[in-house]
């Protein structure tokens, strides 16, 4: 019997987070839904959110038709990088939460790199 798509994704995410925690650097975690994209930067131990950005916020929402396209991912990536640098974080580990490194996830990561985050 096969496991569900979301269960498999969560299993991959759990494995990745174990490896990231060993690195001891803040973690950029991404959540993708059908309509929106969310990004959060957690402390090295994972106990606090340092910075967050998503497609529901007015800085990202302005000028967008919807929050599920590549332009929205680019805006979220740039905004999360700006907010991370504002609190003194420039080096992170990218946690794709079990999603394939493709599409909106890849675009968000590239935009964050272009805006100055190192990972």
Swiss-Prot record:
GO MF term list: 5S rRNA binding; structural constituent of ribosome
Key words, A-Z: Ribonucleoprotein, Ribosomal protein, RNA-binding, rRNA-binding
Biological processes per GO annotation: translation
One Pfam family linked to the record: Ribosomal_L18p
Keyword Ribosomal protein: yes
Subunit structure of this chain's protein: Part of the 50S ribosomal subunit; part of the 5S rRNA/L5/L18/L25 subcomplex. Contacts the 5S and 23S rRNAs.
Role according to the record: This is one of the proteins that bind and probably mediate the attachment of the 5S RNA into the large ribosomal subunit, where it forms part of the central protuberance.
Recorded family membership: Belongs to the universal ribosomal protein uL18 family.
UniProt name for this protein: Large ribosomal subunit protein uL18
Organism (species): Xylella fastidiosa (strain M12)
